């Protein structure tokens, strides 16, 4: 049987979402608290349909069938952080770096974020923390990664990597059909 490109990609993505199970709010309350703390938000998901799943080596929290949180490896161990869809849904005001227009095509292909492209960053950001990268002009999220330097250092860099990218618009997690 032949599928069009979109249908075949959808089937492949659905097969990679593993161990998907509904969970009660009380069983993931601590995860939700840590997820909110990571970006300075107080998340209230008590009325939402919550699921846990596994996708390409990462544990996910699905809220109303949309992957909004992921468990990732950082310099300090493992941490919960919003996915790009989570950033769009919750609009956090912490842990961000803003890039100029020239960096966008590279980030959309999964490249690490270079310091020269970062013009603004959250000053409270420390090396080793998770960071979401946004478009300087529109504020739209583009990628999520681990900061290699502090927020102040990012804005002063003229060369070298500032963020190691983990998840970006267009990757398999972004394209995941749930």
For each predicted feature, which ranges?
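Beta-strand/loop-dominated core regions that host nucleotide or nucleotide-derived cofactor-binding catalytic loops
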Residues: 2-58, 62-119, 124-127, 133-178
């Amino acid at each position: 049987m032949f599928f069009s490109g979109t249908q075949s990609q959808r089937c492949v993505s659905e097969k990679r979402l593993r161990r998907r199970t509904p969970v009660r709010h009380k069983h993931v309350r601590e995860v939700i608290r840590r997820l909110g703390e990571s970006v300075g938000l107080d998340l209230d998901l008590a009325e939402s349909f919550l699921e846990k799943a596994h996708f390409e080596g990462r544990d996910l929290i699905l809220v109303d069938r949309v992957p909004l949180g992921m468990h990732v490896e950082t310099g300090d161990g493992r941490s919960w952080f919003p996915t790009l869809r989570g950033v769009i849904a919750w609009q956090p005001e912490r842990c961000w770096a803003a890039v100029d227009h020239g960096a966008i095509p590279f980030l959309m292909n999964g490249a690490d974020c270079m310091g020269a492209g970062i013009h603004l960053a959250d000053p409270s950001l420390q090396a080793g923390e998770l960071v979401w990268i946004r478009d300087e002009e529109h504020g739209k999220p583009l990628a999520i990664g681990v900061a290699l330097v502090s927020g102040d250092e990012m804005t002063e860099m003229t060369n070298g990597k500032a963020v190691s990218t983990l998840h970006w618009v267009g990757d398999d997690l972004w394209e995941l059909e749930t």
